[in-house]
Design a protein with these regions (language model features):
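Mature catalytic domains of secreted/periplasmic carbohydrate-active enzymes
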Residues: 1-270
């Protein structure tokens, strides 16, 4: 048969060879026994994020490395909107907690340990942000409105945070992230924010892809038509035997069809 023109790039090939990657869901929900953090309301960062000062990123990363893991993906911001790094774009972050008297930076500490032990890093930065006022479409009085009359630009806010992390060499393994992990969950109604994926992905690759001198572009998960590593279709960790098969991408409509059939995404082997 004729050779298939669809072949993995260097990062996709390495993704398969790595075999073991850790996903570290770590944030306010860790201390509040909830999954998404929809009900924090006006509770302060110090109230919801109670990380003790003896948190040891070195032990966390060295344990993963010794267990054979090749990468750790860190939730820098989950749907609750809290940032585990010191962000200049929101007060809803670790600098306003009691952790190390507001001087701690969890993402930087994990990054330093990953650099020390040579463990690749992936960045989880949730596009859906329950806390951020600019998410969704609201007028100057905070009332729901149309996209055209929206007064605050969430897409710019998110892009600024991508720049803040990906453009700073203190984050990542030697300043590098091999993967950026997004998420399909999002709000509805006035909170049904449209995402400027093209702008975001230009920012990602500018700092972490070929444009930055890397061998291959940064891997993207949950990025619609830009996705380069796709979901298996469930959160049970069980994949279909055809999960290796390719997806069909519709760039015009910014969609990806991975032939989903509960509870798997099978792909197309033809």
């Amino acid at each position: 048969p004729a050779a298939d023109k669809v072949v993995p790039d260097a990062n996709q090939y390495k993704y398969q060879k790595d075999e073991l990657a850790a996903f570290c869901h770590f944030g306010p929900n860790t201390f509040n026994e909830v999954e998404w953090g929809e009900h924090y309301g006006n509770r302060s960062p110090a109230d919801i994020f109670t990380l003790p000062n003896n948190f040891d990123a070195d032990t966390l990363v060295s344990t993963l490395k010794n267990a054979g893991f090749k990468k750790v993906i860190v939730t820098a911001k989950h749907h609750d909107g809290f940032c585990i790094w010191n962000s200049a774009y929101t007060d809803y972050c670790v600098k306003n907690t009691h952790y190390k008297n507001g001087k701690g930076d969890v993402l930087a500490e994990i990054s330093e340990a990953c650099t020390k032990y040579g463990l690749d890093m992936g960045l989880y930065l949730s596009p859906w942000d329950i806390h951020e006022p600019s998410y969704g479409y609201y007028d100057a009085n905070g009332k729901p409105t149309s996209k055209e009359n929206d007064v605050l630009d969430y897409n710019e806010y998110y892009n600024n945070q991508l720049e803040e992390i990906l453009g700073n060499s203190k984050y990542g393994n030697n300043g590098h992230f091999v993967e950026v992990w997004m998420d399909g969950a999002k709000g509805s109604g006035a909170n049904a924010q449209d995402y400027e994926f093209t702008k975001w992905f230009d920012t990602i690759q500018k700092h972490q892809g070929k444009k930055a001198g890397k061998d291959a572009d940064c891997m993207l998960f949950g990025a619609q038509a830009y996705t380069t590593v796709r979901w298996i279709g469930n959160e049970d960790g069980v994949a279909h035997e055809n999960t290796w098969a390719k997806s069909k991408v519709n760039e015009a409509n910014n969609t990806i069809d991975s032939n989903g059939t509960t509870p798997y995404t099978i792909g197309y082997a033809d």
